[in-house]
Swiss-Prot record:
Record-linked HAMAP family: PurH
UniProt-recorded name of the protein: Bifunctional purine biosynthesis protein PurH
BP GO terms, sorted: 'de novo' IMP biosynthetic process
UniProt-recorded Gene Ontology molecular function terms: IMP cyclohydrolase activity; phosphoribosylaminoimidazolecarboxamide formyltransferase activity
Catalytic activity: (6R)-10-formyltetrahydrofolate + 5-amino-1-(5-phospho-beta-D-ribosyl)imidazole-4-carboxamide = 5-formamido-1-(5-phospho-D-ribosyl)imidazole-4-carboxamide + (6S)-5,6,7,8-tetrahydrofolate; IMP + H2O = 5-formamido-1-(5-phospho-D-ribosyl)imidazole-4-carboxamide
Residues annotated as domain MGS-like: 1-149
UniProt remark on domains: The IMP cyclohydrolase activity resides in the N-terminal region.
Keyword Magnesium: no
PROSITE patterns: MGS
Gene Ontology CC: cytosol
Length: 527
């Protein structure tokens, strides 16, 4: 087994991203490390006044085919793969010199192919061949060789060389090896995903299928979780390699206990719901369902109205705001109720200071961003369900009035508010709302009319008046009984997708009760 610490005497540098290259090369030269390099990397090092030897000089074989072949040579791979204490004789016989450090990043395939005008030819030319081969050779031989794949690794690498008099530890070499294999896997996955989605290879800029023949996913571990969905289950949180700006995965935890699986699942539901509103809004979630949502003049006003919907369920809930959380609102929340997680795009200093008095409360900051997830996925037994994300919004102009009475301006505003909330309630979903606040929420029932009754019951428990409210349903009413129940509760307007074979009966029921009803033509099932 190789020594724990091994010196770096010779390094091969070949990078597409030249960030930090010259500083790294200069530091290595200062330690009398011999530099080998290729193409543009060698040119950059040479122009910085540093000594460097071209790989072509090492191999005696020129770069060819516009740089496609330059490092695919036994003198390169033998120098990376040669084992200490095993291969010295054969290396000496064939004139192979050991390479102790490989610094390499790959052709920018990912950044090139995300461009809308990327041609298939451009994509193919940015598939690196020699780079991944060298990374694999160096990473496999971590017992002797170190490999760096990212400029972010340079500082730590140089720091260890400084502390250990020009040597790298076995632990550092192994960690760098794992990172290199991960990078190669990510790179190959990106190539596979791109090519698998090409619908017609004869097109210069190919049409790409939204559901390719094969999917390769890459997620990076962020943290171990307190536990899974239940305490007897373990859990961890992984982030997409390229997270969408503004989504939950970009959060920063400012304080609080370890997060659990349920914390993050509920936080995602709360955050996705609240970020669809422009005015100050508060969403309170319990077991992945909004139990109170409101828009107000500020965070404090929105919180008071959302909390009033269902104070019982709000206990131990997840609270999300779409504006900077002020100190007064933070104090009002934490003095009143037990909170699992607070979420906001930012916090006033006073809000954070007050939160420290409740040290167990998890405080998450999610930077503003308008990005939307393009897909939703769900694991089933030995399989994956994949669909385009439900990012469909609704405007007033898209609503179809189907009853004799049209909703008035105030009702229209409340209908759109309730519709936005219903999208994030588990099916069957019913939402009662008035004045841009929820009055009652019925979630997750097998019968739609039962969900409507639960929404009314919740309003009664909270001592809120349903009369004059509007109702949103995530899917059509199969029978008129849902409208009859709404009328009995005092509902004045309804928003629903429509599309039932009994729409005529449902519309007639609304007309009988003087209820205004609009169809969206869009369903929002959520399971």
């Amino acid at each position: 087994m190789a020594s724990d610490f091994l010196p770096v005497r010779r390094a091969l540098l070949s990078v597409s991203d030249k960030t930090g290259l010259i500083d790294l090369a200069r530091a290595l030269v200062a330690r009398n490390v011999e530099l080998l390099s290729t193409g543009g990397t060698a040119k950059a090092i040479r122009e910085a006044g540093l000594p460097v030897k071209d790989v072509a000089e090492l191999t005696g074989f020129p770069e060819m085919m516009d740089g496609r072949v330059k490092t695919l040579h036994p003198l390169v791979h033998g120098g990376l793969l040669g084992r200490a204490g095993v291969d010295e004789a054969v290396m000496a016989e064939h004139g192979i010199v050991p390479i102790d450090l490989l610094v390499l990043n790959l052709y920018p395939f990912e950044s090139v192919t995300v461009k809308a005008d990327c041609t298939l030819a451009d994509a193919v030319e940015n598939i690196d061949i020699g780079g991944p081969a060298m990374l694999r050779s160096a990473a496999k031989n971590f017992a002797r060789v170190a490999v760096a794949t990212d400029p972010a690794q340079y500082a730590d690498l140089l720091a260890e060389l400084e502390v250990n008099d020009g040597q790298l530890s076995a632990a550092k070499r192994f960690a760098l090896s794992v990172a290199a294999f991960n990078r190669v896997a990510q790179y190959d996955a990106a190539i596979s995903n791109y090519l698998s989605a090409v619908a017609d290879s004869s097109e210069a800029v190919p049409t790409r299928s939204p559901f390719p023949a094969q999917i390769n996913s890459n997620f990076v571990k962020v943290m171990d979780l307190r536990y899974g969905e239940n305490p007897h289950q373990s859990g961890a949180f992984y982030r997409d390699l390229y997270p969408v700006p503004g989504t939950l995965a970009t959060f920063q935890q400012l304080q609080g206990k370890e997060l659990s699986y349920n914390n993050l699942a509920d936080a995602d539901a709360a955050w996705e719901c609240v970020r669809q509103f422009d005015a100050p809004a508060c969403v309170i979630v319990k077991h992945a369902n909004p139990c109170g949502v409101a828009v107000g003049a500020g965070c404090g006003d929105a919180y008071e109205l959302a909390y009033a919907t269902d104070p019982t369920s709000a206990f131990g809930g997840i609270l999300a705001f779409n504006k900077t959380l002020d100190a007064a609102t933070a104090k009002a929340i934490l003095d009143r109720q037990f909170v699992e997680v607070l979420i906001a795009p930012d916090y006033e200093a006073g809000a954070l200071e007050y939160a420290t008095r409740k040290a167990n409360v998890r405080v998450l900051k999610i930077p503003h961003g308008n990005g939307l997830n393009n897909y939703d996925t769900k694991r089933i037994g030995s399989g994956l369900l994949m669909q385009s994300a439900d990012n469909r919004s609704m405007s007033l102009g898209e609503l179809s009035v189907v009853t004799q009475r049209a909703p008035n301006e105030a009702e229209l505003g409340d209908l759109l508010f309730a519709w936005r909330v219903a999208k994030y309630v588990k099916s069957n979903a019913i939402v009662y709302a008035k004045d841009s606040r929820t009055i009652g929420v019925g979630a997750g029932q097998m019968s739609r009319v039962v969900s409507a009754k639960i929404a009314a019951l919740k309003a009664e428990e909270a001592k809120l008046t349903v009369a004059g409210s509007v109702m949103a349903s995530d899917a059509f009413f199969p029978f008129r009984d849902g409208i009859d129940a709404a009328a009995a509760a005092g509902i004045k307007a309804v928003i629903q997708p429509g599309g039932s074979m009994r729409d005529g009966e449902v519309i007639a029921a609304a007309d009988e009760h003087g209820i205004a009803m609009v169809f969206t033509g869009v369903r929002h099932f959520r399971h």
